[in-house]
Amino acid sequence: MNKLKSSQKDKVRQFMVFTQSSEKTAVSCLSQNDWKLDVATDNFFQNPELYIRESVKGSLDRKKLEQLYNRYKDPQDENKIGIDGIQQFCDDLALDPASITVLIIAWKFRAATQCEFSKLEFMDGMTELGCDSIEKLKAQIPKMEQELKEPGRFKDFYQFTFNFAKNPGQKGLDLEMAIAYWNLVLNGRFKFLDLWNKFLLEHHKRSIPKDTWNLLLDFSTMIADDMSNYDEEGAWPVLIDDFVEFARPQIAGTKSTTV
């Protein structure tokens, strides 16, 4: 790091804090991305295996990982971990299966559907994370959570959740399931989440299409406290148009009673 300019050293430090990676990895990734911090962090999170130089995969004990998989695999189907195995996996991690942390792990494993991991998803996911034990996976959790602070990565995680949560073969996501997952992933991120849930339960009562799911994230990040910046002529789904119409009088009423 001594040969670097002071501005580059600052970027290395910031990169290390943000990605929880080593100095060697930070220098390697930044130098390959023209020392643009935002581009480098985004590329790192999308393809960590391209930049991690600590030979994480080389130090992985494949036999140990296979034994770990065998602890969880379905007795009736050795190519997947079923619901009982997932429960054991969560118990070993001391995590609630319904927690956002378990959803983040599923995202990192690129899991296709809830309540199970295929053998390939588990083995590849653990390998990519450089983990051959529960202890190593536990140690990776803060890094995974940190990753979601980057908006592009959170968007990827959010969009993954729709496909993960829905029943295979169904186009839309059942309303109750959608609300449960919105409460998990948008809690603290969408100021009108409770009002949105109330609106859906009172006025919608149908499944949620993918475009509505995806665009709600954009809506949640741009909408003003009084919804005055909402463009009715914009390319928003009808459901979001209807929600704004439902919510505006309630927001105005709340403000007048608190003044």
UniProtKB/Swiss-Prot annotation:
One of the record's GO molecular function terms: ubiquitin conjugating enzyme binding
Keyword tags: Nucleus, Ubl conjugation pathway
Domain UBA-like: residue ranges: 8-45
Principal subcellular localisation of the protein: nucleus
InterPro entries: DCN-prot, DCN1-like_PONY, PONY_dom, UBA-like_sf
A cellular-component GO term for this protein: ubiquitin ligase complex
PROSITE patterns recorded: DCUN1
Keyword Nucleus: yes
Compartments, as annotated in UniProt: Nucleus
Superkingdom of origin: Eukaryota
GO BP terms: positive regulation of protein neddylation; protein neddylation
Residue stretches making up the DCUN1 domain: 60-248
Main function: Part of an E3 ubiquitin ligase complex for neddylation. Promotes neddylation of cullin components of E3 cullin-RING ubiquitin ligase complexes. Acts by binding to cullin-RBX1 complexes in the cytoplasm and promoting their nuclear translocation, enhancing recruitment of E2-NEDD8 (UBE2M-NEDD8) thioester to the complex, and optimizing the orientation of proteins in the complex to allow efficient transfer of NEDD8 from the E2 to the cullin substrates.
Protein name in the entry: DCN1-like protein 1
Organism this protein belongs to: Gallus gallus (Chicken)
Primary gene name: DCUN1D1
